[in-house]
From Swiss-Prot:
This protein's UniProt keywords: Electron transport, Heme, Iron, Membrane, Metal-binding, Mitochondrion, Mitochondrion inner membrane, Respiratory chain, Transmembrane, Transmembrane helix, Transport, Ubiquinone
TM regions (residue ranges): 33-53, 77-98, 113-133, 178-198, 226-246, 288-308, 320-340, 347-367
Gene3D superfamilies named in the record: Cytochrome Bc1 Complex, Chain C (1.20.810.10)
Protein name according to UniProt: Cytochrome b
An example Gene Ontology molecular-function term: metal ion binding
Subunit structure, interactors included: The cytochrome bc1 complex contains 11 subunits: 3 respiratory subunits (MT-CYB, CYC1 and UQCRFS1), 2 core proteins (UQCRC1 and UQCRC2) and 6 low-molecular weight proteins (UQCRH/QCR6, UQCRB/QCR7, UQCRQ/QCR8, UQCR10/QCR9, UQCR11/QCR10 and a cleavage product of UQCRFS1). This cytochrome bc1 complex then forms a dimer.
Coiled-coil regions listed: none
A single cellular component GO annotation: respiratory chain complex III
C-alpha cells in the first residue's frame, strides 16, 4: 500500500523525526525541554516578526516606537511582553535542558552536545543584541559595557570595538546593525536546531538509566507527542501568568528611561539569565582576565565529555557526584544573585569564591568523584 507518510520525500523526514521515531520507553519529563525549546523558538520568531513590523531601528525613534507598540498597536502590549518574557522562558528551558544533559550524561553524544553548546552561544548573542533594541538606559549602557569588553583583546581590541560600534561610541549605526543581527540570528538558531536533531537521531535519545535502550523502544507518536503537549500547556500557562500579571517582574526599571549617554545608571546589569556569567566576569579585577573567564564559563561545557571519568553514564546511581551536581546548581544560583548586586563587600568575595568553586567543581571535583566511585564499585 502506498503511504505518503513513509514515502514522500518531505513528509517522511517529518515522520522519522516526530512520528515513527524510536524513543526509549522510560524517558521522564526532563526530556520534555527539547520540544519546549522548539515551542519557545517558534513563539519568539512569530512575536518578533510582528514587533519588527512596527519597530524602528533609529536612536531618535526606537524608544517611542516600542511605546507606540504597547499603546497604539492592537494587542501590541501582549506581543511585546510575550516576546520579552518568552526570552526568559527560553532561558529557563535551556538551563533545565543543559542540567538534564549534565545529570544523565547526555553529553556522551558529543556531536549533539557540541552543537548544543554552539546553540547556547548563538541564543545568548541573540538575547544580548535584542536587549539593546528598546533603547532604554539599560539597553544603551549594557551594550556599551559588554561590547567594550572586546577592547581587552590585545592589539586589535580597540579597532574591533569601533568596527562593531560603527563609530566612536554606541550610536545609530550600532542600533541598526544590532537590529539586523537580532533579525537574522533566530534563523541561525533554527538551522542549528535542525542539525542538533539530526545528530541526536543518529544515536537516539539517552534515558534515565544511562543504559542502551535499543531493546525497548516505542514510537514517539502518540506516546511522547501527548506527553510533550502537557509540557506545552504548563509552559504556556507559566508564560501567560508572567505576561498578564507581572510582565515587568524580570525586566529592569531603568529600561523605561530613554537612553542617555550623559547619565550612567547606578547599577549596570544584564537580564537575569546572564547574571551568573556577569558575576564571573566581575569577580576578576583584570579586564582581559574577566573576559577570558566569561568565555570559559560557557566554553567549559564543551570540555565536559572529556572530563567524564565514571564507568556509569548518568548520576542516577552515583550519590557522591549527585551531591556535587546539586552544589554546582546552588553555586550557579549564588552567582546569579551576586551578578545583580552592587560591587561592594561582602558580594565581591562571595562572587570570587563562587566563581572559583564553579570551575573547580567541573574540572576537578566531579571527575575525581567519578574515579572514586569507580574504585568503590570494586570493593
Amino acid at each position: 500500500m502506498h503511504n505518503p507518510r513513509k514515502t514522500h520525500p518531505l513528509i517522511k523526514i517529518v515522520n522519522h523525526t516526530f512520528i515513527d521515531l524510536p524513543t526509549p520507553s522510560n524517558i521522564s519529563s526532563w526530556w520534555n525541554f527539547g520540544s519546549l525549546l522548539g515551542m519557545c523558538l517558534i513563539i519568539q520568531i512569530l512575536t518578533g516578526l510582528f514587533l519588527a513590523m512596527h519597530y524602528t531601528a533609529d536612536t531618535t525613534t526606537a524608544f517611542s516606537s516600542v511605546a507606540h507598540i504597547c499603546r497604539d498597536v492592537n494587542y501590541g502590549w501582549l506581543i511585546r511582553y510575550l516576546h520579552a518574557n518568552g526570552a526568559s522562558l527560553f532561558f529557563i528551558c535551556i538551563f533545565l535542558h543543559i542540567g538534564r544533559g549534565l545529570y544523565y550524561g547526555s553529553y556522551m553524544n558529543t556531536e549533539t552536545w557540541n552543537i548544543g553548546v554552539l546553540l547556547l552561544f548563538t541564543v545568548m548573542a541573540t538575547a544580548f543584541v535584542g536587549y539593546v533594541l528598546p533603547w532604554g538606559q539599560m539597553s544603551f549602557w549594557g551594550a556599551t559595557v559588554i561590547t567594550n569588553l572586546l577592547s581587552a583583546i590585545p592589539y586589535i581590541g580597540t579597532t574591533l570595538v569601533e568596527w562593531i560600534w560603527g563609530g566612536f561610541s554606541v550610536d545609530k549605526a550600532t542600533l541598526t546593525r544590532f537590529f539586523a543581527f537580532h533579525f537574522i540570528l533566530p534563523f541561525v538558531v533554527a538551522a542549528l536546531t535542525i542539525i542538533h536533531l539530526l545528530f541526536l537521531h543518529e544515536t537516539g535519545s539517552n534515558n534515565p538509566s544511562g543504559l542502551n535502550s535499543d531493546s525497548d523502544k516505542i514510537p514517539f507518536h502518540p506516546y511522547y507527542s501527548i506527553k510533550d503537549l502537557l509540557g506545552f500547556f504548563i509552559a504556556t500557562l507559566v508564560l501567560m501568568l508572567l505576561v498578564l500579571f507581572t510582565p515587568d517582574l524580570l525586566g529592569d526599571p531603568d529600561n523605561y528611561t530613554p537612553a542617555n549617554p550623559l547619565s550612567t545608571p547606578p547599577h549596570i546589569k544584564p537580564e537575569w539569565y546572564f547574571l551568573f556569567a556577569y558575576a564571573i566576569l566581575r569577580s576578576i579585577p583584570n579586564k582581559l582576565g574577566g573576559v577570558l573567564a566569561l568565555v570559559a564559563s560557557i566554553m567549559i561545557l564543551a570540555l565536559i565529555p572529556m572530563l567524564h571519568t565514571s564507568c556509569q553514564r548518568g548520576l542516577t546511581f552515583r550519590p557522591l557526584t549527585q551531591t556535587l551536581f546539586w552544589i554546582l546548581v546552588t553555586n550557579l544560583l549564588t552567582l546569579t544573585w551576586i551578578g545583580g548586586q552592587p560591587v561592594e563587600q561582602p558580594f565581591i568575595i562571595i562572587g570570587q569564591l563562587a566563581s572559583i568553586l564553579y570551575f573547580l567543581l567541573i574540572t576537578t571535583f566531579i571527575p575525581l568523584a567519578g574515579l572514586l566511585e569507580n574504585n568503590l564499585l570494586k570493593w
